[in-house]
Amino acid sequence: LADGKFTEPARTAHARIPQPIHLEDNETVAYFSPEFGVSEMLPQYSGGLGVLAGDHLKAASDMRMPLIGVGLFYRDGFFRQALEQGRQRERYVTNNPRFLALTATPARVELTLADKVVTARVWQANVGRTRLFLLDTDLEINDEWGRRVSDRLYSGDREHRMRQELLMGVGGIRAIRQLGYEPAKFHLNEGHAGFLALELLAEEVGKGLTLSQAVEEIRKRIVFTTHTPVPAGIDRFAPDLMHKYLGVWAERFGVNMNELLELGILPGSDDHFNMAAFCIRV
């Protein structure tokens, strides 16, 4: 170390490294995404959206930003492709979280989905300095229906997708709060976790605000990015599903269901609830 020829290049290289961003503890950012492409050793991603999310976590670690990731643990992950007689086939490989780079946390989250209560445990992955929390409903306390909520990434019908998105959004907030986090900002990587706004709205309405006032209040804390602004890349839910799963939320807000649905319906379109529109408005 006394040899300047050795230490000077190291000092020069270190000086070129950007200084870490120092934020206060109360400025934690919670980054919600349906997939995280951190490593092939943690197969919880499909493609570009997940790779982007994984890179965000790694960059946050490098810059020492107080960011945490929140998503779902998919026991069967995303399908793998195989060819049989020239035709594509899909197959799934079951992932045992205890054999992955995951640690069980003490958090347990309960969420009512329509008329059923589902419980989720929370796994933690360390991405450098950044923490990633993944909710998993494959618990014996749940019935078979409940255990399948977090089974696969981007599979199932629209109702299955709605259950997953309610779990990720509403359940995700409850999970990280149990673990001691109170984020200043919530970053939505696409609209899949947009239902987290329901939990935030309920808290503000509980303080005496109207729904419209609550929307203005939570808007200060939500950041939304969309990467595929085309119909095929945006989740849309039919009115019957919205009434089935969000009717209880309208009651909590003290409004009729139509007033809640207006937050996600585009003018001149059909009556389906558009998650991108909802996330932009809140």
Where are these regions (language model features)?
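Catalytic cores of carbohydrate-active enzymes across secretory and cytosolic contexts
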Residues: L1-V282
